[in-house]
């Protein structure tokens, strides 16, 4: 991958005044992304609260039409398991999952055509986030292209792949040029989700503070290693993001972040509770990762077990919390159920 020194070496620290920031947030918190908090785009077709999986990877089974240009692995040929949108829809229907947010899988690289086509096939049930090369000088324009021309709803940035100098380093997270991307995101109404390591969060915080109207999701509890000898310093970096009302967290991937890795992951509950107490139930999201039979291949529980994790296993979520986390929060965030 080509290295762009201007992006990696010109990180800036925004001097946004705390009071000005909070005033800006206050003016926009009730209307985030065009949705007032009184609007209810929450109902499933049967009138019940929706179940929205906010983190679903799907990939094509047709490499000629949808190739696999993995950006970090030149030797990559094809995924080890199938994970098509047809598998996803069957899984959703079987377990009462009303909607999903597709998150472009790394297998298809920066070509988001497959997830865009999936949304066109199932526009009432799916939204999609693409991947774009964060070191590309035209990243803002490419985001606009995928959103305006192909109907994507946001972008994922996988900062974790650039940690510790990998692939040119993660200086792009808060580089001067990156502010243009965030300004464009505000204009487009884009939602960002970040696959990011805890020690990278201070760089993200710079951007969140400078752009309080851009909605940002931290994936997988910031891929926290809860089995580390002392996870507390990293965990505090995640909790520090709670003071920004435009930040949400996915309570996901407990199979990989918990110490035990064994369902229902009770050793992770004390940490999840601290995130819950810091961010509140309105800014937590449900997401699982893979469709159908692919779940077992990637060591993930079945979809019904993932749903039960919030409904039956994690002990401190109230019934109202469960509805919010499993779907209502996502309905607000992405506008599920609203006419387009």
Predicted regions and their residues:
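Mid-to-C-terminal alpha-helical segments outside catalytic/metal-binding sites
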Residues: 2-8, 15-33, 45-54, 72-99, ...
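Boundary at the C-terminal end of the N-terminal hydrophobic targeting segment
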Residues: 41-43
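Histidine-centered divalent metal-coordination motifs
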Residues: 55-61, 220
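Active-site gating loops and adjacent loop-to-helix segments of metal-dependent hydrolytic enzymes
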Residues: 60-86, 91-95, 149-168, 214-215, ...
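Alpha-helical scaffolding within the catalytic cores
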Residues: 84-88, 111-114, 138-142, 201-204, ...
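Active-site gating/metal-coordination segments in enzymes
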Residues: 98, 108-199, 206, 250-254, ...
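Catalytic pocket-lining loop regions of alpha/beta-barrel enzymes
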Residues: 153, 170-286, 294, 321, ...
């Amino acid at each position: 991958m080509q290295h762009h020194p201007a992006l990696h070496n010109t990180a800036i620290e925004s001097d946004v005044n705390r009071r000005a920031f909070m005033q800006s947030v206050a003016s926009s918190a009730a209307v985030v992304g065009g949705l007032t908090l009184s609007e209810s785009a929450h109902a499933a077709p049967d009138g019940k609260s929706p179940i929205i999986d906010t983190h679903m990877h799907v990939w094509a089974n047709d490499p000629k039409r949808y190739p696999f240009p993995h950006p970090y692995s030149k030797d990559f040929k094809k995924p080890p398991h199938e994970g098509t949108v047809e598998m996803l829809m069957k899984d959703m229907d079987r377990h009462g999952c009303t909607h999903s947010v597709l998150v472009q899988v790394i297998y298809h690289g920066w070509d988001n055509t497959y997830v865009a086509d999936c949304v066109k096939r199932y526009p009432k049930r799916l939204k999609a986030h693409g991947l774009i090369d964060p070191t590309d000088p035209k990243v803002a324009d490419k985001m606009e292209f995928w959103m305006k021309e192909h109907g994507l709803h946001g972008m994922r940035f996988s900062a974790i792949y650039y940690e510790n100098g990998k692939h040119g380093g993660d200086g792009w997270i808060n580089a001067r040029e990156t502010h243009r991307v965030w300004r464009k995101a505000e204009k487009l109404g884009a939602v960002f989700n970040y696959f990011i390591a805890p020690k990278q969060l201070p760089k993200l915080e710079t951007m969140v503070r400078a752009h309080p109207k851009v909605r940002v999701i931290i994936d997988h509890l910031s891929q926290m290693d809860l089995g580390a000898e002392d996870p507390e310093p990293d965990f505090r970096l995640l909790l520090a993001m709670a003071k920004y009302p435009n930040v949400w967290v996915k309570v996901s991937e407990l199979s990989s972040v918990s110490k035990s890795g064994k369902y229902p992951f009770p050793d992770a509950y004390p940490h999840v509770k601290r995130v819950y107490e810091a961010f509140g139930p309105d800014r937590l999201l449900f997401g699982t990762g893979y469709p159908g039979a692919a779940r077992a291949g990637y060591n993930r529980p079945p979809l019904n077990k993932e749903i039960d994790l919030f409904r039956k296993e994690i002990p401190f979520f109230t019934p109202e919390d469960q509805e919010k986390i499993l779907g209502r929060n996502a309905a607000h965030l992405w506008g599920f159920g609203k006419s387009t």
